């Protein structure tokens, strides 16, 4: 149970030797997630790693940027509070998961994300950590099959020895049963890439599926449903996907 308490919302402080590459070439402004190029780097790195999971996965989604989650991820980073935020502060139109990272020096986003992914070395897929002390929650968050969107923020916290604080949000939040994931070490289905989505596959990842659900069977039958505010609330999939 102690292991489960720390599994999915973990904060990382990775060794300098792992992440020192090119750190001197970065400035806080260059890492700002308000920049389109930085957003693209973060999304691209996540999708690159999701394509290379081992064993291969049949149902991992191709991730996109979430602008609303970017705002609250940056707000959390700016607070310089090295702890996970409550779920209500990680909610936009979706509830979102969270990875944290702190460093005494600036680290490229791609290296931060790679560091999270590299926790796979301590994980036996479908079973759990190789040792009780192995941290694998960041990796699981990065490769969780139903991650549809990602957004991040970074801030400088001068009063903290680990003065650079990175926050990433993953939407929707992991599939929970009570307080913990029902199958925490099965982040995806181990089959050939896109085997679960042959009609909507892009370079080994499943393309966007609808994040909403219709509440009534008649939603797709009524032409005017999306023009009526009350009906639209019951037909979110029809009206927004």
Curated annotation (Swiss-Prot):
Main localisation: cytoplasm
Species this chain originates from: Mus musculus (Mouse)
Tissue expression: Expressed in submandibular gland.
Bridged cysteine pairs (disulfide): 194-201, 197-206, 210-241, 219-235, 226-239
Protein keywords: Cytoplasmic vesicle, Disulfide bond, Glycoprotein, Signal
Residues glycosylated per entry: 118, 132, 175
UniProt-listed Gene3D superfamilies: CAP (3.40.33.10), Crisp domain (1.10.10.740)
Physiological role: This protein is supposed to help spermatozoa undergo functional maturation while they move from the testis to the ductus deferens.
Induction: By androgens.
SUPFAM superfamilies from the UniProt entry: Crisp domain-like (SSF57546), PR-1-like (SSF55797)
Protein name: Cysteine-rich secretory protein 3
